[in-house]
Amino acid sequence: MNKFIYPGSFDPVTNGHLDIIERASKICDKLTVAVLINQSKNPLFSIEERVSLLKKVVKGSTNIEIECFSGLLVDFVKEKNANVIIKGLRAVSDFEYELQMALLNKNQAPDIETLFMMSSINYSFLSSSMVKELARHGGNISGLVPECIEKEIIDKFKLK
């Protein structure tokens, strides 16, 4: 069974993330979207909220699960008996960082592969940071995030 892991902070999940999730789920038997618990970051959405948003976004998908993790990614990949890490790339700048991470992961776990997926051209400019900045200032985020969670993102800034 081919098990892939797609890690990220997903703060919040964007249509770019969803594009990678949908495409990756078509080439594996089981895709785990792994939401990183990173103590050094100050996320807008709690880990529970990010997991909940992702579950809404992939509702109805039969081979996708959402989990959170902390610590080393390769340890989580081994724990899930997965064999591939999926990383989405938007630009050359993403590649430089992700290549270093892939090589480090390969050093730590030689049997785990990293598969780079290019973002669809429609989302090559998109990041969670950009969505948050737009939402913070009342900009239009429709088309940038899954429609089913758009209101929750907008409402988050109304509470701040």
From Swiss-Prot:
GO terms for cellular component: cytoplasm
Keyword Ion transport on entry: no
GO molecular function, one term: ATP binding
Reaction equations catalysed: (R)-4'-phosphopantetheine + ATP + H(+) = 3'-dephospho-CoA + diphosphate
Swiss-Prot/TrEMBL site (Transition state stabilizer) positions: H17
List of residues binding substrate: S9, K41, L73, K87
Keywords from the named record: ATP-binding, Coenzyme A biosynthesis, Cytoplasm, Magnesium, Nucleotide-binding, Nucleotidyltransferase, Transferase
Localization (cell): Cytoplasm
Principal cellular location given in the protein's record: cytoplasm
E.C. number: 2.7.7.3
Listed pathway(s): Cofactor biosynthesis; coenzyme A biosynthesis; CoA from (R)-pantothenate: step 4/5
InterPro entries for the chain: Cyt_trans-like (IPR004821), PPAT (IPR001980), Rossmann-like_a/b/a_fold (IPR014729)
Binding site for ATP: S9, F10, H17, G88, L89, R90, E98, Y123, S124, F125, L126, S127, S128, S129
Cofactors, names only: Mg(2+)
Top-level class of the enzyme under EC nomenclature: transferase
The protein's role, per its UniProt record: Reversibly transfers an adenylyl group from ATP to 4'-phosphopantetheine, yielding dephospho-CoA (dPCoA) and pyrophosphate.
Family the UniProt entry places it in: Belongs to the bacterial CoaD family.
Record protein name field: Phosphopantetheine adenylyltransferase
Gene: coaD
